[in-house]
Amino acid sequence: MPKSILLINGPNLNLLGTREPHIYGSTTLADVEAASKAHAESLGATLESFQSNHEGAIVDRIQAARGRVDGIVINPGAYTHTSVAIRDALLGVGIPFIELHVSNVHAREPWRHHSYFSDKAAGIIVGLGVYGYRVAVEHVAVNFKELEKANL
C-alpha cells in the first residue's frame, strides 16, 4: 500500500507567490501543491494538500487524518509561534510530522524564533524556499520507517 502524506499549510500561505516575494519567492501555493503531489507519486506515495487561515480548521484536518495518513508535512505559518492547539492535535493523533518553513525564521524577527512544534517534529526544514517542500515530501516517502519510530 502506498504511503499517504498530508501536506498542511497555515495562514497566509494561500498568498505564496504574491506575498513578500523577496522573502517567500514567486512560486504559488498551487504550484507547490502540484509539484509536491507529483514528487510524492514519483516515490510511490500519495499526497493530499490542505490550507487554511483558521486554526480550528487545521486542528480538524489533523484529527481527521488519524489512522488514515502515514506522515504529515506542515508549514504552520504564523501559528508556529502561537498555536498550542495545533501542537496538541499533532501529538494527539500520533502521526509523525515534518515542520517546514520557506524562509529562515531564525534570521528574521526575534518573535519568529520560537516554535511550538520543533521539539516534537521528526524533522525541521527552514530557509530552503519552496524546495523545502520537495525535501520534506521525499523524507516522509523514503524514510517512513525511521519516522515511524519517532519519539512523539
Swiss-Prot record:
GO terms of biological process kind: 3,4-dihydroxybenzoate biosynthetic process; quinate catabolic process
Domain of life, source organism: Eukaryota
Protein residues bound to substrate: 75, 81, 88, 102-103, 112
Keywords assigned by UniProt, alphabetized: Lyase, Quinate metabolism
Pathway entry: Aromatic compound metabolism; 3,4-dihydroxybenzoate biosynthesis; 3,4-dihydroxybenzoate from 3-dehydroquinate: step 1/2
Any GO molecular function: 3-dehydroquinate dehydratase activity
A Pfam family that the UniProt record links to this protein: DHquinase_II
Sites annotated Transition state stabilizer: 19
Classification via InterPro entries: DHquinase_II, DHquinase_II_CS, DHquinase_II_sf
Enzyme Commission number(s) from the entry: 4.2.1.10
Record-annotated active site: 24 (proton acceptor), 101 (proton donor)
Catalyzed reactions per annotation: 3-dehydroquinate = 3-dehydroshikimate + H2O
Nucleotidyltransferase listed as a keyword: no
UniProt subunit comment: Homododecamer. Adopts a ring-like structure, composed of an arrangement of two hexameric rings stacked on top of one another.
PANTHER family named among the record's database cross-references: CATABOLIC 3-DEHYDROQUINASE
Family label: Belongs to the type-II 3-dehydroquinase family.
Role played: Is involved in the catabolism of quinate. Allows the utilization of quinate as carbon source via the beta-ketoadipate pathway.
Protein name in UniProt: Catabolic 3-dehydroquinase 1
Natural source organism: Aspergillus terreus (strain NIH 2624 / FGSC A1156)
